[in-house]
Regions:
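Glycine-rich phosphate/diphosphate-binding loop of Rossmann-like nucleotide-binding domains
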Residues: 1-39
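Glycine-rich phosphate/pyrophosphate-binding loop and the adjoining helix
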Residues: 128-162
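Short, glycine-/small-residue-rich phosphate/pyrophosphate-handling segment
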Residues: 91-137
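Short glycine/serine/threonine-rich phosphate/pyrophosphate-binding segments
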Residues: 12-16, 40-44, 63-72, 91-94, ...
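Glycine-rich phosphate-binding loop
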Residues: 47-85
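N-terminal beta-loop-helix "entrance" segment that forms/cooperates
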Residues: 32-53
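Active-site-proximal loop->helix
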Residues: 20, 45-48, 75, 92-104
């Protein structure tokens, strides 16, 4: 299964690339597209309707400002959609966050923090890992590596003051 990263504008790419790299680090294939919910709604509908048959298991929808992309995609598919609010000059991304998180009943969009591309990638991998023991093991290794880093930093700081 693949993870699709769909962004409303190519200006979102510097943020989205962090999520793409995260997913690729787990050995998961990605599909990356620029589709606007407002300027190319037909393309958004077509992408969402054909995502599953194209091997996509999770969609990460990145958008700023009005940020309707995730909701539009979720309306046309049954696969999970993760909304990634992008910080824009307007309201520092709060407008994006609220646009994504306030979905009507029956059309959920999981939402991560503003510019939280790495967590969007991790969440997408966790969703795929529900049916994939190899991915689940990679996630366990990843979490242990994070814990080991914190333990090393803890030891270094403690050693400075003991």
């Amino acid at each position: 299964m693949k993870v699709a990263f769909v962004m409303g504008s190519d200006s979102d790419l510097p943020v989205v690339e962090k999520g793409i790299k995260t997913v690729q680090d787990f050995g998961v294939e990605v599909v990356v597209r620029v589709i606007s919910a407002h300027r190319t709604p037909g393309a958004a509908e077509e992408f969402a309707k054909t995502a599953e048959e194209n091997g996509i298991g999770v969609i990460v929808a990145a958008a700023g400002k009005a940020a309707h992309l995730g909701g539009v995609l979720a309306a046309y598919t049954t696969i999970p959609v993760i909304g990634l609010p992008i910080k824009s000059s307007t309201l520092d991304g709060l407008d994006s966050l609220l646009s994504i998180v306030q979905m009507p009943p029956g059309i959920p969009v999981a939402t991560v923090a503003i510019d939280g591309a790495e967590n969007a990638g991790i969440l997408a991998v966790q969703m795929l890992a529900l049916g994939n023991a190899e991915l689940k093991e990679k996630l366990k290794v990843h979490k242990k590596a994070m814990a080991d880093k914190v333990a090393a930093k803890d030891a270094a700081v403690a050693a400075r003051f003991c």
